[in-house]
């Protein structure tokens, strides 16, 4: 769910204790929704002295060796009395009842997406590191919408920045090269790449900028998969030798090797979405947009496509690199 008031994240956990087996996972706050539609809300102000905790010794070191998913559940058949008793009421009693919230750990090797069909929510991941247990800061818990994850919001904003920058740079590439007398086959092939990105931008950018934030993470991958597929299909129309020359040309100016470029595009096309491993999806997406942006940016900075990068001379005066 969305972060509660006065919190920047929907959920917060911490690890207390020094040793691996003596470490305790403690829930600080959360606002989550299970697939069944049940809400799990925990705030210390609501629950008073009750604090959901789980000690790793209950799981066993061997089970935790491969890492664990941290999960929470709300037991509506086990209620916690909360609130301040009315001194005028006899017998004294707490005025409210809230469901007991429990936190537990599931070995990663035992976890799969079937766990998401139960009435609990995975909120984090932990790893044994040295003699202690640490939270995986890179892990992105399953969320219903990108808006519910700070990491995914940041990733989407980064993608939007890269796409906008590429669109500006593509305009510069066209301006410099479309009427240039030095226009070559290489120029036309770079235009092919630019058009693939351009067409994707025209058809997808409104959705990315305005709608995707309210969509599940798989829609994010779907959108970037369309970009990768557009590029892959466009580049297939270039004869092999010309295609290889273009990738080598990119390599000369950006140090992005042909194999790295092809792997980056291929990783997006082949990735199978895993709701328990959203961080992998995010890494693959960011690698593609940053790689494309670096190439397009450099091509836009050249006087014309086809300019050859000759030997680099190191200036004795300034230690800066200059093209001959």
Model-predicted segments: where are they?
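Mixed-charge (acidic/basic) macromolecular-recognition segments
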Residues: 90-225
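"Short basic amphipathic alpha-helical interaction patches in structured regions
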Residues: 44-47, 82-98
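Elongated alpha-helical scaffolds
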Residues: 51-86
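Ordered hydrophobic segments in well-structured contexts
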Residues: 29-31, 68-73, 121-125
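Short helix/loop capping segments that flank catalytic or ligand/cofactor-binding pockets
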Residues: 42, 81-82, 135-137
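N-terminal "first-domain core" detector
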Residues: 1-40
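Extended, amphipathic alpha-helical scaffolds
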Residues: 211-324
């Amino acid at each position: 769910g969305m972060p509660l008031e006065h919190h920047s994240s929907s959920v917060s956990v911490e690890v207390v204790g020094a040793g691996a087996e003596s470490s305790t996972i403690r829930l600080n706050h959360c606002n989550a929704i299970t697939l069944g539609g049940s809400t799990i809300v925990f705030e210390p102000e609501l629950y008073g002295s009750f604090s959901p905790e789980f000690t790793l010794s209950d799981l066993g070191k061997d089970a935790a060796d491969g890492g664990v998913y941290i999960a929470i559940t709300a037991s509506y058949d086990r209620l916690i009395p909360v609130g301040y008793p009315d001194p005028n009421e006899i017998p004294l009693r707490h005025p409210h009842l809230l469901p007991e919230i429990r936190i537990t750990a599931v070995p990663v090797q035992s976890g799969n997406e079937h766990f998401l069909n139960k009435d609990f929510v995975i909120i984090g991941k932990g790893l044994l590191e040295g003699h202690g247990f640490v939270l995986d800061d890179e892990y992105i818990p399953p969320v219903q919408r990108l808006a519910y994850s700070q990491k995914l919001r940041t990733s989407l904003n980064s993608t939007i920045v890269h796409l906008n920058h590429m669109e500006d740079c593509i305009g510069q590439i066209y301006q410099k090269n479309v009427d240039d007398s030095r226009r070559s086959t290489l120029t036309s092939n770079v235009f092919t790449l630019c058009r693939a990105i351009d067409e994707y931008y025209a058809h997808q950018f409104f959705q990315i900028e305005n709608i995707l934030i309210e969509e599940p993470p798989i829609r994010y991958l779907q959108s970037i998969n369309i970009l990768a597929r557009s590029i892959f299909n466009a580049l297939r129309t270039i004869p092999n030798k010309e295609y290889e020359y273009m990738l080598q040309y990119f390599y000369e100016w950006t140090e992005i090797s042909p194999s790295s470029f092809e792997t980056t595009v291929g990783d997006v096309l082949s990735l199978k979405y895993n709701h328990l491993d959203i961080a992998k999806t995010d890494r693959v997406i960011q690698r593609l947009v940053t790689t494309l942006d670096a190439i397009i940016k450099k091509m836009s900075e050249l006087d014309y496509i086809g300019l050859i990068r000759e030997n680099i001379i190191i200036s004795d005066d300034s230690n800066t690199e200059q093209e001959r």
